[in-house]
């Protein structure tokens, strides 16, 4: 996802082969890919299930992590993962992200506060965090997944000013109007912290419900 087109071209001019692994769309750069970054990595380096097994990894878990990177929890079942396999992948995902309960007490408390004050407007969750040091989006996503059979749309405000709209078919429309970036198979949109004045839920809902 880095270092960016200018430096990438400089590297090419210097004789380096540059291979980009990314799956996002940014303001002035479209790097969408149906495969997640992990899945692309496995393909580019021709890493097989046997290779993963020899390296001490569970291939099924690794493939599941790749699916979660592009489709989160909701992508596992369509990709053929059983309920028990999905549970294993989720635990491993959170372990590697340092999200398991007790490993980051400050984050857990922030998520709890945000979750308790959640509200819904026009069928869309609105969730706000007061933590300027840690982002809560992924943990909130796990809570939404535990309480819903299908992914509900949500607007998540981070304490540092970042805003994310996820599980929303209008993510490309939000991108067209407000810039930022898309991810999650074009079902999620976000804008970096403090890059622009904070968008209100009302401003976002106009497009989400368009």
Predicted regions and their residues:
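Glycine/small-residue-rich interface belts in oligomeric ring/scaffold proteins
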Residues: 1-35
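Short acidic, S/G/P-rich loop/turn micro-motifs used as interaction or catalytic elements
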Residues: 3-6, 25-27, 72-74, 131-136
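Charged/polar, solvent-exposed surface patches and flexible loops
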Residues: 9, 13, 43, 63-67, ...
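Gly/His-enriched, cation/cofactor- and phosphate-binding structural elements
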Residues: 11-19, 46-53, 112-210
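Short alpha-helices
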Residues: 23-94
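Exposed alpha-helical structural elements
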Residues: 60-64, 88, 106, 139, ...
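Active-site rim beta-loop-alpha module in soluble metabolic enzymes
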Residues: 76-141
């Amino acid at each position: 996802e880095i270092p960016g087109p200018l430096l990438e071209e400089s590297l090419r001019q210097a004789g380096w082969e540059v291979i980009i692994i990314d799956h996002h769309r940014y303001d002035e750069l479209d790097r969408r890919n149906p495969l997640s970054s992990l899945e692309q990595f496995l393909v580019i380096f021709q890493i097989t299930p046997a290779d993963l097994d020899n390296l001490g990894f569970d291939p099924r878990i690794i493939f599941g992590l790749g699916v979660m990177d592009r489709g989160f929890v909701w992508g596992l079942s369509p990709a053929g993962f059983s309920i028990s396999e999905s549970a294993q992948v989720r635990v491993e995902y959170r372990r590697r992200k340092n999200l398991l309960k007790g490993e980051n007490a400050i984050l857990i408390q922030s998520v709890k506060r945000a979750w308790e004050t959640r509200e819904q407007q026009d069928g869309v969750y609105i969730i706000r965090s007061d933590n300027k040091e840690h982002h809560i989006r992924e943990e909130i996503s796990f809570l939404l997944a535990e309480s819903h059979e299908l992914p509900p749309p949500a607007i998540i405000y981070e304490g540092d000013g970042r805003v994310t709209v996820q599980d929303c078919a209008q993510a490309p429309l939000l991108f067209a109007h407000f810039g930022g970036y898309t991810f999650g198979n074009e079902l999620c949109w976000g804008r970096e912290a403090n890059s622009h004045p904070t968008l209100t839920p009302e401003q976002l809902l106009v497009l989400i419900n368009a």
